[in-house]
Amino acid sequence: MKKLTTILAGTAFAAGLAAATPTFAMDKMTVATPGIPPVFAGTILYVARDTGIFKKYNLDVTIKAMNSGAAAAKAVDSGSVDASLSPSQFVVRMVSNAGAPLKAIWGMEHPDWIIASMDASKASCAAIKGQGVGVDSKRGARWIQLNTYLARKCKMKIEKDVPTVPMSSNVGTAMASGQINFGVLHIDDVPVIERMSGKKVHTVARIEDVVPGVHYLMMIARADKIAAKRDAYVRFVAAMRDASKMIHDPANTDKIAKLAKPTKRTGADAIYAVNAYRKMEFWPNGTLGLGKSRIMKAVANQVGVGKRTKGRGGINPKKTPVTYEQMTDLTLWEDAKKMMK
């Protein structure tokens, strides 16, 4: 009986000790990704979440798909989300024109955009004039690519000479069904459209050829939020690095393709996308993905757009363009490298 009493007392003590031991809550973050459904670039967030990488760094991340990367950037600026994957050219314009307190903390350098047509005989500036072109949203990422192409190659004005049709990330579906002939696409849209329509998709222009060396996407956050939760953001950057490393291992192709399910790419389409994007280092391979030359090319392009449109688009000529140092926070990456798990 005495032995039983001792055991019970010990059990009670252990239970009391466990109750008294503090449990450290995971840091909650909401991160926005462009497109409904999400574009394939956002796959990296689902990889980090669903393989437990975020959890490994004590992060509880909610991924929020938004109509466009532009809308996602505005959500960061308003404080309604903690970070977003947003088009670099939109962000540098936003910071330059409005003084938005945004910092790029990670990035994707290589754009995959193409201007495409379902008709081989309609693949020129003359053919696109007056035709509706599928984009994500007004002044969204696809809209910006079209505007750049029209201004640089066609000497035309978007909306005035070429109207746009906002469709979030459903441009490909609209082209496959015959609703529109022209659209701004990601390369992973092409095989899906061709299978659905039974027709070939024709490339009118590659944005990488129109504006060589321009930066594609930035993971952005408000400077004040970074200051307030810096340790959490360091761990977030570390998680992005680990997820990118996982994606770049060819042995993980099938696994990554399955994790891309939220993008609505499945089976062979998802495997095609993973391989194609890995080849072009769509997600950075061992780097931060915020190369100075590409980011400053994005700034220069938006300065040019601003001059050509007299401030109606791009960076307003009356504003001072953002510098590389103002646009980026590289210190999070440096600290993240010290704590890679």
Model-inferred region functions:
Residues 19-25:
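Sec/Tat signal peptide C-region and signal peptidase I cleavage site
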Residues 46, 92, 147, 191-194, ...:
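Predominant activation on well-ordered alpha-helical scaffold segments within soluble catalytic domains
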Residues 9-19:
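Bacterial N-terminal signal peptides
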Residues 25-177, 181-187, 203-207, 212-213:
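Short, glycine-/small- and polar/acidic-enriched structural segments
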Residues 1-9:
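Bacterial N-terminal signal peptides that target proteins for export
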Residues 299-341:
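Conserved C-terminal helix/tail region of periplasmic/extracytoplasmic solute-binding proteins
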Residues 170-264:
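Pocket-lining segment of extracytoplasmic ligand-binding domains
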Residues 227-312:
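Secondary-structure end/capping motifs
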